[in-house]
Amino acid sequence: MATVPELNCEMPPFDSDENDLFFEVDGPQKMKGCFQTFDLGCPDESIQLQISQQHINKSFRQAVSLIVAVEKLWQLPVSFPWTFQDEDMSTFFSFIFEEEPILCDSWDDDDNLLVCDVPIRQLHYRLRDEQQKSLVLSDPYELKALHLNGQNINQQVIFSMSFVQGEPSNDKIPVALGLKGKNLYLSCVMKDGTPTLQLESVDPKQYPKKKMEKRFVFNKIEVKSKVEFESAEFPNWYISTSQAEHKPVFLGNNSGQDIIDFTMESVSS
């Protein structure tokens, strides 16, 4: 018959009359002063097992007694001194979860704010001034206004109007105006001391975006059945056309005979 080898490590003497109590249903409750009182409400306190320094002979029964004693302790009923509240969960969350910083490569240079772009609303329109002149792409980077009819009506450009961030206002809607199918956007810059309208080439991977640079932003203002486009970079300067035929579209300050009122014709995507 196989024999159980003797344990080689030091172990306290549990071979006493009280050891048998651990094998009873309510054994540990009958023992007094054997274990330290503990409170689960305090994370720094716990059950402590003290090992005696006495050197005695060990047996398999002593090892089993220790194991059974620990198992019995797990089953001891404990009355909690407080009612568990939601805020108590924060104590455990700090051990379970680890905070990590949120990193983003894009920061707003003006306001030093974190910018997270999302898909923006975009509609397509044809624009005509109040004299019904259409806007066409004359040179690679120049728009002109002229009357079209017949087959050449398809020469007029289609604008991709993106609704972007801008100054809060009840009667002004900030938009960016790009040419559909081309990487060109209308922008306003200062040239020779005068606010100037131009077509600017952009990276299609970066544009359009919700937070457009201010030179690209126009405040769309509805006046009865017409619309005006005021430069956000240069207030009181508007996208304008001349009374004359076949003249470039420019940025004007609503003086003289400049035309700043347009009609919009919606185009399906």
Swiss-Prot record:
Name listed for the protein in its UniProt record: Interleukin-1 beta
Localization annotation: Cytoplasm, Cytosol; Secreted; Lysosome; Secreted, Extracellular exosome
Gene Ontology terms describing biological process: astrocyte activation; cellular response to interleukin-17; cellular response to mechanical stimulus; cellular response to xenobiotic stimulus; defense response to Gram-positive bacterium; ectopic germ cell programmed cell death; extrinsic apoptotic signaling pathway in absence of ligand; fever generation
Secreted in keyword set: yes
One GO location term (cellular component): extracellular space
Site (Important for interaction with integrin): K172, K180, K182, K191, K205
Organism this protein belongs to: Mus musculus (Mouse)
Assembly notes: Monomer. Interacts with MEFV. Interacts with integrins ITGAV:ITGBV and ITGA5:ITGB1; integrin-binding is required for IL1B signaling. Interacts with cargo receptor TMED10; the interaction is direct and is required for the secretion of IL1B mature form. Interacts with HSP90AB1; the interaction facilitates cargo translocation into the ERGIC. Interacts with HSP90B1; the interaction facilitates cargo translocation into the ERGIC.
Induction and repression of expression: By LPS.
Segments forming a coiled coil: none
Prodomain positions: 1-117
Note: IL1B production occurs in 2 steps, each being controlled by different stimuli. First, inflammatory signals, such as LPS, stimulate the synthesis and promote the accumulation of cytosolic stores of pro-IL1B (priming). Then additional signals are required for inflammasome assembly, leading to CASP1 activation, pro-IL1B processing and eventually secretion of the active cytokine. IL1B processing and secretion are temporarily associated.
Keyword Secreted tagged: yes
